[in-house]
């Protein structure tokens, strides 16, 4: 039997000190035999007590193959001191395979110091405390008595049992915690049947129960409400050794059986890893003579163990959590990793802590989940923020891509709608990948992506508003700019040849260009929709703002074109056209000065008649007025470029030239036209100067020979006839003046070139000697040096 015996550990020594190594002892044997047990409840505690030297330790050693110290029969003295505990690896059995069976139920047995020992004498304090400890921690309480002690009060430990009953009633009255009292009657020789002995003991126990001082509220409780009684008889160990072993085996079969002795109602429901702490706290309460509240002790153990388990689980979770490089993982990998980490932590806690008090277990579980979620939420929130950024970037990228394609019929607000739909779809699809908790999980409300979705929707809404406003400004800038580029040419062409009907024609052209540029925004109901998703009122407001910009651009074009310089140039051009050319567009050949005076006066008056047309833009109905008040908008535009000089009245649309401007133009026009008049007058006077008659006679006398040579020479006469014919044609076509001017210009050019050539020759000739002389002087200077 020695190879099957297991060493014991002292739980409480004779000095009433609890052994802190008990927890390691119990875990050691429990883990060896219950590696697959998750709850830690597959164990049983069996205690034995009785009078000293009655063979309690011997009984346990034979029954459970333990190694408790036994009494030396040569010396009658105390052997078991304090309370000892041992794991029963094997239990005696009568089965055919051997004389023992494996301890699959993890039975731990406690050997309690015997009562009525001479070592303690009258001091019964430890006896009562030990009995109370055994009752508080054990499922089965073995009471070891001799057959001849049945019927005795002290010998059968009935006095101690009375104390046990009273304490049990005070401890377990609320929850009616049950316990099995197993009376093992030793040295039964068979003269008195076991049934008779059982009846005697049962009657004694009931008498003791009836005489108890029951606490208030427990008067109606009976012995059967708290204790189950069973009786076993064992033969004499020395006189009937074989029978004794047989009876031990039969008793062992009862412990092995599923329904003979053990009952779920006896179990204290303390997991094995918390039993040592529970036992220590119970003993501390007993030792300090405090009221022992076992349910409270169980709660305290549950709290301690659940906190300990929670810390261990969180440390394991955190170790795995910090190892993960979340930035390098995809959304699917992040979701799976977070889900696995969270589920593993919760499941591990459920396995280890679910064995304790449900209220404590759930409370600590909630705290653990909150702590785990704090870490996970950092990653979860970070991922959601990353998703928001990516969704926003996708939104802008979709818009840019659609607008860049410039497809026909593209509508701006539809582009925004499509981009928003794709952005939200991207966000929702990826949030579903990282959603790793059920929506019914009350602890998972922090993982609801709805707040972040609303944040994204709000951000997209703000972006949409910003883009729509930007597009409105773009429309108010781009379309008026295009209007200006088109209408500017029309204004230049029309005002360059201004006439009384020009302003009416320009106004018609203004409306035509405006309608043409806005035609694509016009809806069938004659309203305007700029495809920005705006309301009817907003579209109307934008349309008016664009038209205001058109009028402002109209005003800018007029201001740029109708300036003193341009108007003066146009008036002078008009004057020259009428003064230099006739109605057929041919250059005028002046015959006399009177003709110049008439033509000059007519041309100048005709040109000056155009000045009022430039000064005021008006039609037959009156001056042109914008359809909208552009004073405020125009003033804002001008304030960025120039300061108000006190004379500018920007709100007067039709007033282009002030009286001062007109006077300045008239004065400059008068000076330029007067200069032209004088030049023309001088050229006519020069061409009309008369040659004296004697000059002709003198030419005839002196040039008679030359004249005759020409007449006699056919070539010369031919050239003369051609020259005369050309002069005649020039005279008839009134081109003699231009011909003379061209000839004079040619002669002048020939003279200039001749002078330049002569100057070059005269200047270049003396240069060579001077250079030689200078060179010699330089050489002479060098020689002197």
Swiss-Prot record:
Gene3D superfamilies: P-loop containing nucleotide triphosphate hydrolases
Boundaries of every GB1/RHD3-type G domain copy: 40-266
Enzyme Commission no: 3.6.5.-
Segments traversing the membrane: 691-711, 715-735
Record keywords, A-Z: Coiled coil, Endoplasmic reticulum, GTP-binding, Hydrolase, Membrane, Nucleotide-binding, Transmembrane, Transmembrane helix
Residues annotated for GTP binding in this entry: 50-57
Any one GO cellular component localisation term in the record: endoplasmic reticulum membrane
KW Coiled coil (keyword) present: yes
Lumenal topological domain: 712-714
Coiled-coil residues: 451-479
Broad enzyme group: hydrolase
Major location (coarse): endoplasmic reticulum
SUPFAM superfamilies: P-loop containing nucleoside triphosphate hydrolases
GO MF terms, alphabetically ordered: GTP binding; GTPase activity
Localization (cell): Endoplasmic reticulum membrane
GO BP term (any one): endoplasmic reticulum membrane fusion
Pfam family, one: Sey1_3HB
Family statement drawn from the similarity comment of this UniProt entry: Belongs to the TRAFAC class dynamin-like GTPase superfamily. GB1/RHD3 GTPase family. RHD3 subfamily.
Protein name stated in the entry: Protein SEY1
Organism encoding this protein: Komagataella phaffii (strain GS115 / ATCC 20864) (Yeast)
Encoding gene, per UniProt annotation: SEY1
């Amino acid at each position: 039997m020695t190879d099957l015996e297991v060493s014991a550990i002292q739980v409480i020594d004779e000095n009433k000190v609890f052994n802190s190594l008990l927890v390691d002892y119990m875990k050691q044997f429990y883990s060896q035999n219950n590696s697959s047990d998750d709850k830690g409840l597959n164990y049983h505690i069996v205690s034995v007590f009785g009078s000293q030297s009655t063979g309690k330790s011997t009984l346990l050693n034979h029954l459970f193959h333990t190694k408790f110290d036994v009494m030396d029969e040569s010396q009658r003295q105390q052997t078991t001191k304090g309370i000892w505990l041992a794991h029963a690896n094997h239990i005696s059995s009568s089965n055919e395979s051997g004389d023992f069976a494996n301890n699959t139920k993890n039975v731990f047995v406690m050997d309690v110091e015997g009562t009525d020992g001479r070592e303690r004498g009258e001091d019964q304090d430890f006896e009562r405390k030990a009995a109370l400890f055994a009752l508080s921690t054990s499922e089965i309480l073995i009471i070891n008595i001799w057959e001849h002690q049945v019927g005795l009060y002290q010998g059968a430990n009935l006095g101690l049992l009375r104390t046990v009953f009273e304490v049990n009633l005070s401890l377990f009255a609320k929850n009616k915690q049950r316990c099995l009292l197993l009376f093992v009657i030793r040295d039964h020789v068979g003269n008195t049947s076991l049934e008779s002995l059982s009846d005697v003991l049962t009657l004694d126990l009931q008498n003791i129960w009836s005489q108890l001082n029951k606490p208030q509220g427990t008067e109606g409780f009976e012995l059967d409400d708290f204790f189950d009684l069973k009786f076993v008889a064992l033969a004499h160990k020395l006189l009937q050794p074989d029978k004794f072993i047989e009876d031990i085996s039969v008793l062992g079969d009862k412990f092995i059986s599923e329904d003979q002795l053990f009952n779920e109602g006896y179990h204290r429901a303390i997991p094995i890893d918390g039993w040592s702490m529970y036992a220590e706290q119970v003993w501390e309460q007993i030792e300090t003579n405090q009221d022992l509240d076992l349910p409270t002790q169980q709660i305290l153990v549950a709290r301690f163990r659940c906190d300990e388990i929670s810390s261990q689980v969180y440390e394991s979770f955190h170790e795995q959590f910090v190892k993960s490089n979340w930035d390098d993982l995809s959304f699917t990998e992040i979701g799976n990793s977070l889900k696995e980490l969270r589920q593993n932590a919760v499941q591990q806690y459920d396995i280890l802590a679910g064995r304790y008090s449900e209220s404590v277990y759930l409370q600590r579980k909630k705290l653990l989940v909150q702590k785990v979620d704090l870490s996970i939420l950092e990653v979860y929130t970070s991922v959601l923020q990353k998703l928001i950024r990516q969704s926003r970037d996708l939104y802008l990228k979709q818009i840019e891509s659609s607008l860049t394609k410039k497809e026909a019929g593209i509508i701006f607000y539809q582009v925004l709608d499509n981009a928003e739909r794709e952005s939200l779809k991207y966000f929702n699809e990826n949030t579903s990948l990282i959603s790793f908790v059920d929506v019914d999980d009350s602890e998972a409300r922090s993982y609801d992506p709805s707040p972040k979705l609303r944040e994204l929707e709000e951000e997209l809404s703000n972006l949409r508003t910003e883009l729509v406003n930007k597009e409105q400004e773009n429309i108010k800038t781009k379309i008026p700019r295009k209007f200006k580029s088109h209408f500017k040419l029309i204004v230049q062409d029309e005002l360059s040849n201004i006439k009384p009907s020009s302003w009416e024609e320009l106004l018609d052209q203004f409306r035509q260009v405006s309608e043409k540029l806005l035609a694509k925004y016009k809806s069938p109901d004659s309203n305007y929709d700029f495809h920005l998703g705006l309301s009817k009122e907003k579209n109307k407001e934008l349309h008016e703002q664009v038209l205001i910009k058109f009028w402002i651009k109209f005003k800018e074009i007029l201001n740029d074109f109708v300036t003193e310089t341009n108007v003066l140039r146009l008036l002078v051009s008009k004057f020259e056209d009428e003064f230099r050319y006739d109605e057929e567009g041919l250059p005028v050949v002046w015959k006399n000065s009177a003709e110049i005076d008439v033509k000059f006066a007519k041309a100048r008056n005709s040109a000056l008649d155009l000045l009022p047309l430039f000064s005021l833009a008006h039609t037959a109905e009156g001056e042109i007025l914008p359809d909208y008040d552009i004073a405020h908008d125009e003033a804002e535009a001008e304030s960025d470029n120039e300061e108000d000089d006190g004379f500018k009245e920007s709100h007067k649309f039709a007033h282009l030239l002030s009286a001062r401007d007109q006077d300045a133009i008239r004065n400059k026009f008068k000076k330029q036209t007067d200069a032209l008049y004088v030049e023309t007058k001088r050229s006519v006077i020069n061409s009309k100067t008369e040659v004296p008659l004697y000059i002709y006679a003198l030419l005839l006398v002196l040039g008679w020979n030359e004249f005759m040579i020409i007449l006699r020479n056919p070539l010369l006469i031919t050239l003369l006839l051609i020259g005369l014919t050309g002069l005649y044609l020039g005279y008839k076509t009134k081109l003699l003046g231009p011909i003379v001017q061209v000839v004079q210009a040619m002669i002048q050019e020939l003279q200039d070139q001749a002078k330049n050539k002569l100057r070059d020759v005269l200047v270049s000739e003396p240069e060579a000697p001077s250079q030689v002389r200078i060179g010699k002087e330089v050489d002479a200077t060098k020689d002197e040096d």
